[in-house]
Amino acid sequence: MNNQKYIRNFSIIAHIDHGKSTLADRLIEYCGGLQAREMSQQVLDSMDIEKERGITIKAQTVRLVYKAKDGNTYYLNLMDTPGHVDFAYEVSRSLAACEGSLLVVDSTQGVEAQTLANVYQAIENDHEIVPVLNKIDLPASEPDQVKQQIEDIIGIDASEAVLISAKSGIGIDLVLEAIVNKLPPPKESSTDILKALLVDSWYDPYLGVVILVRVIDGSLRKNMKVKMMATNSVYTIENVGYFTPKKHISDVLHAGEIGFFTASIKQVADCKVGDTITDEKKPCKQALPGFKPNLPVVFCGLYPTDSSEFEHLKDSLAKLRLNDASFEYEMESSSALGVGFRCGFLGLLHLEIIQERLSREFDLDLITTAPSVVYKIHMREGEVLEIHNPADLPDLQKIDSMEEPWIKATIMVPDEFLGAVLSLCTEKRGIQLDHNYIANRAKVVYKLPLNEIVYDFYDRLKSCSKGYASFEWQMDTYEPSELVKLGILVNSEVVDALSTIVHRSRAEQRGRALCVRLKDLIPRQQIDIAIQASIGSRIIARETIKALRKDVLSKCYGGDITRKRKLLEKQKAGKKRMRQYGNIEIPQSAFIAALKIGDE
């Protein structure tokens, strides 16, 4: 198959739950990619978490063969991309592998914030976009209003939008005809020298790393030696093929085609998404544009609740890293929690998914420390440090200034909840950049500190809008900020696991909230326990757990007063010794609850 005019490479853009994976299932079914008995819901979402949460995490591809009404047979390469903001870079690379997109919008809900972000990326990649309105068989469907929304918000013509119901299969043939007639074929190859885009990769226990590629120029053949331009690694191709969505082995992938190859590569970390693959003997002169390394944005500590599970956790993280190169970890120890790992994630959803996979696939019970972000610390000597662990923060006297990351957030919300959303953004130190109305929905754009987002922003946004607000963000800039390290002391001992870096204006509120929470969680002892929040050497909040009174005189029935006095003196001396050397045991449940504090 080398006639490029019969190839269509396209992706499906949609907000979570707007029916993207269901539409992909119907297209596969219609084109006979799988037998009816092999079909399952969300065929392309392979992980259980993907199916349960209704999200796509890894990019998947499928080649469909479609005989169109014009009598020609077309080869359609569907690229199923992640829709969540944490995986925005993967989305941009998947879109770069295609020439067109289907924009799927739920006709009962309208355009959402995440749809916007991905549509703008598709427009940047010069995609031809075909609007598709899903769920038209539902009573609440408003296709005309949603068409108007698409034109007003995104600015593309929606008058000929395809009306479908992916669940019941209405209009699937119209979608396939629109793909053939409205989306362009790949550009003609200008050279025979191999140039291919690495779209995604995952680990297969039998084949090693499987690499998903889009061939731009030349062709990719079995036994060919190829070079990765970002890492300069050279590999010999062992298998070449494509998915239907079953794996099919072929001898060659031509320009314009999307498929996979294997080359006994051991680690996914060696295969960077967005890299350019070329022939080792005749390399192309220039790499494809847009490659950038995927850097973690959110960090937190993961500790096993039982220290004997440490080796199991270490092995489990290594296995997850095989399949997820954007996830990073290094060992760290805490006096309160023992030995664990400091892990880096692309965002909060990524963190949640890794946590869930560790507990589900590896049966681990973990404590997660408060999430933090990367701060830039300008030292007085001129050195610039990047830190994400509060324990690494240098002495305040040596610091000249600190910078924290800010993000640009787009929020779409029904106008009746707008007031609550605006006050939440203001409370989180947000700066409003834009605000406009489309029909009965408002679109607001805010600049917000990432530090404030990683705690509980998303949960609070959903609760103050009854679940109707949608939220999308991208990194913006680093800006100078008055940051301080908030320490927690129990009985004058610093508890390192509860230390956080916060903005000075929020320090007292968060410190007080933590002290109050810990007061309820730490069991009473025979002495008073002071729980304090501090900035440097200054105490900003304090709570005291009152002592239990142990009645040492209960066994003295009558008798001489000196006997009673002797027992009381002995107890007094014991308490003094306890205050001096006493070690307060903080139960694990207290840590877990205290770390969930958010901004209460």
Swiss-Prot record:
Q: Which GO terms describe its molecular function?
A: GTP binding; GTPase activity; guanosine tetraphosphate binding; ribosome binding; translation elongation factor activity
Q: Per the annotation, which location comes first and is thus the protein's main one?
A: membrane
Could you identify this protein by its name? Elongation factor 4
- Which InterPro entries does the record cross-reference, listed alphabetically? EF-4, EFG_III/V, EFG_V-like, EFTu-like_2, G_TR_CS, LepA_C_sf, LepA_CTD, LepA_IV
**Residue span, tr-type G domain:** 5-187
Cite the binding residues for GTP: 17-22, 134-137
- What's the protein's topology in the membrane? Peripheral membrane protein
